[in-house]
């Protein structure tokens, strides 16, 4: 049995990319592994946010987790902010990281450029040290595997580097070195309008993003209007047919069909027929998720389970934070 750790930010609404890149992985892994899955609300305050929206989004994300099939009794699912050891270890890790390596993080460069697009906005320090909190999220639990999308791979590699660095400095196996878990398909779903960029809740043009709580008729419209090409041939070729390849990835993830099977299925068929099948598969999934979501969001069941899991989690991580503090000469944590 492996220990697996991962989480998703509680900003805006989760997307089909979040589901296929992360949530579906969690569901597949939860039966045979020990899983710590958190709603990353502390990561959500690294950029400008509205407190009332954040509070609502936290519960929304938790309800979507449950609606998608994550078991709150089998897994330890919790709010990141409910376990203070995350931020405590994050500070310690920040003290063992370097300005240069944090400056090289691609996500920091991209997000800081967007934040300061007009040249007058200050860049939050939290955005710069985001990878340190992510490293703490992982190393705190001695994770064996961490399911991440391709865009988080660099942060994951940094977490490994810092763990190795601290183990070497203190001449002890303070942290387990985690491995990346990345599924072959679905780790990165692209935008429907611009398949050169990742499908994201923060993209300016929402026509390219499918949100899990979108109306199904809107979802179908987005898929039918998705960018393809003039070849009118369903073929997996990311370089020459990025739009079609992206739709094939989505269809593959939802039907468990390989790309060559999909190519054969739609041989001599036009893009309209192909898009209709993709839309059918996506809408079937979303109808089921949304029905269950309403039940969970409008009850107190999830909040009660999150509170119970946070207590369980704190008991586990306090042992780890004590070990870290003692190793650094900081004494025993009394929290």
Curated annotation (Swiss-Prot):
Q: Which reaction does it catalyse?
A: tRNA(Trp) + L-tryptophan + ATP = L-tryptophyl-tRNA(Trp) + AMP + diphosphate + H(+)
Motif 'KMSKS' region location, chain numbering: 198-202
Which GO cellular component does the record give, naming just one?
cytosol
Give me the residues that bind L-tryptophan, please.
137
- Localization (cell): Cytoplasm
Query: Which molecular-function annotation in GO is an example for this chain?
Result: ATP binding
Keyword terms: Aminoacyl-tRNA synthetase, ATP-binding, Cytoplasm, Ligase, Nucleotide-binding, Protein biosynthesis
GO biological process assignments: tryptophanyl-tRNA aminoacylation
This molecule's function is given as:
Catalyzes the attachment of tryptophan to tRNA(Trp).
Mind telling me which NCBIfam families this protein's record contains? trpS
Q: Tell me the protein family, please.
A: Belongs to the class-I aminoacyl-tRNA synthetase family.
Protein name (Swiss-Prot/TrEMBL): Tryptophan--tRNA ligase
Q: Give the source species.
A: Malacoplasma penetrans (strain HF-2) (Mycoplasma penetrans)
